[in-house]
């Protein structure tokens, strides 16, 4: 599993000189380019850091094989970007450009642009992809009910609270495009592994989450549904009449009870659909090896659905992003008498996703103990420096660390490790589960 996160970037200036988003992004990545000779690099912890289309910094975690490991490495991405932010602000100050840089782990900006949080799952090549997409699509359309990041949407009539930031920007169900049409599931076949054994399922519909528990639920529930599909579990047919209309309808309904149209004229609510998937997950747990992390996911999944059904969120208001955010807005409105259309609510919405510690609203809530965690600061710090020790990422991270220490010129990607010397020595690592490889050890020893 892995998560790719694009960050929103902006800068407020104290003086007269202004910088475009492109220029701000270049300041952010100046330190990266100075050592990596590129704005597209792999790090010692196995992750990829690069400047994506539209001046959005993007962090792709290393391959992870457990949910807690993935959450730690996702949070490590925030720390890596925060370091770049602090360094860039110092450079601006040195050049007499007073300004504060903001990086937001969200999915929309004030101009209506959207940027993503993509989940990657390694699935077996065997079997029909259409079965995966048929079962997964209704799940993903309604999953925002349990793991949306929440958003205040300004409409011509009034401001309204929505479950998902990403839902309004999705235009296809299944497609090979990522930016033009923004599908729910991307079918571009780039397994980054042995293509005869595996395919990489690329889910681009999810919101960027701040709460660790929500990230764990988002990825863990999807991974469990995929596991059940591969195990041959049968699901009720929830094929949607129009997934693009449905995803918006679900996002606008915090009760989860409004019916969406299914194929053939049937109807079901988001709550109905999620209840079915959750019930199958509970049943599946009885037949699989015990895993406390997966059990934690299924427990939170069920509690969140119960909270939505009862419209009583007290038992999940420290664990689910959209619930945390909605409670924050309601308290702010009660205190100041604002309605949702007030610019200060929009400002609070954005500040929730500010990744700078001590400034971002989510970080303030976390420091006050108002959101639940599954990591420790120490484990996140470790993930900033070190790759997962149980996947191929360890080979990549060890190789990069050794090559940098030896001052060697090298090239890496997800599957290749290459020393750029006269011999052009390259090792191909096609097994994402393999963390020990004699060929890589010999390559490192040769430096």
Swiss-Prot record:
ATP binds at residues 48, 61, 414. It comes from the Bacteria. Mg(2+) binds at residues 4, 50, 58. The keyword Protease does not apply. Pathway: Protein degradation; proteasomal Pup-dependent pathway; Protein modification; protein pupylation. NCBIfam families: pupylate_PafA. Belongs to the Pup ligase/Pup deamidase family. Pup-conjugating enzyme subfamily. This is Pup--protein ligase 2. It comes from Rhodococcus erythropolis (Arthrobacter picolinophilus). The lineage of its organism: Bacteria, Bacillati, Actinomycetota, Actinomycetes, Mycobacteriales.
């Amino acid at each position: 599993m892995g998560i790719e996160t694009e960050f929103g970037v902006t800068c407020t200036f104290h003086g007269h000189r202004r910088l475009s988003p492109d220029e701000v992004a270049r300041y952010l990545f100046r330190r990266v380019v100075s050592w990596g000779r590129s704005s597209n690099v792999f790090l010692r912890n196995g992750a990829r850091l690069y400047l994506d289309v539209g001046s959005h910094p993007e962090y792709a975690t290393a391959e992870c094989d457990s949910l807690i490991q993935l959450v730690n490495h996702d949070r490590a991405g925030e720390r890596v970007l925060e370091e770049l932010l602090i360094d860039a602000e110092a450079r601006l100050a040195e050049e007499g450009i007073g300004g504060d840089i903001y990086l937001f782990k969200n999915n929309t900006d004030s101009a209506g642009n959207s940027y993503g949080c993509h989940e990657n799952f390694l699935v077996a090549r065997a079997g029909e992809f259409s079965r995966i997409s048929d079962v997964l699509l209704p799940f993903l359309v309604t999953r925002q009910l349990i793991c949306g990041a929440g958003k205040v949407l300004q409409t011509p009539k009034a401001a309204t609270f929505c479950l998902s930031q990403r839902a309004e920007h999705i235009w296809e169900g299944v497609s090979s495009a990522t930016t033009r049409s923004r599908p729910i599931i991307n079918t571009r076949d780039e397994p980054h592994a042995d293509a005869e054994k595996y395919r990489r399922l690329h889910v681009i519909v999810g919101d960027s989450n701040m709460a660790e528990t929500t990230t764990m639920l988002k990825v863990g529930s999807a991974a469990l549904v995929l596991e059940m599909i591969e195990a041959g579990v049968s699901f009720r047919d929830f094929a949607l009449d129009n997934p693009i209309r449905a995803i918006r309808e679900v996002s606008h309904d915090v009760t989860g009870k409004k019916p969406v149209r299914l194929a053939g004229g049937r109807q079901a609510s988001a709550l109905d659909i999620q209840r079915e998937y959750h019930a199958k997950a509970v049943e599946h747990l009885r037949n699989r090896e015990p895993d406390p992390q997966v059990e934690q996911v299924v427990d939170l999944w069920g509690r969140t659905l119960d909270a939505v059904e009862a419209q009583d969120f007290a038992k999940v208001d420290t664990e689910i992003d959209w619930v945390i955010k909605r409670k924050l807005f309601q308290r702010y409105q009660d205190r100041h008498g604002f309605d949702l259309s007030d610019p200060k609510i929009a400002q609070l919405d954005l500040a929730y996703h500010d990744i700078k510690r001590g400034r971002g609203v989510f970080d303030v809530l976390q420091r006050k103990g108002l959101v639940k965690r599954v990591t420790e600061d120490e484990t996140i710090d470790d993930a900033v420096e070190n790759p997962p020790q149980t996947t191929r990422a360890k080979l990549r991270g060890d190789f990069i660390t050794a090559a940098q220490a030896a001052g060697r010129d090298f090239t890496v990607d997800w599957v290749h490790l290459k020393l750029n010397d006269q011999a052009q020595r390259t090792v191909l690592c096609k097994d994402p589960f393999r963390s020990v490889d004699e060929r890589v050890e010999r390559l490192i020893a040769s430096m």
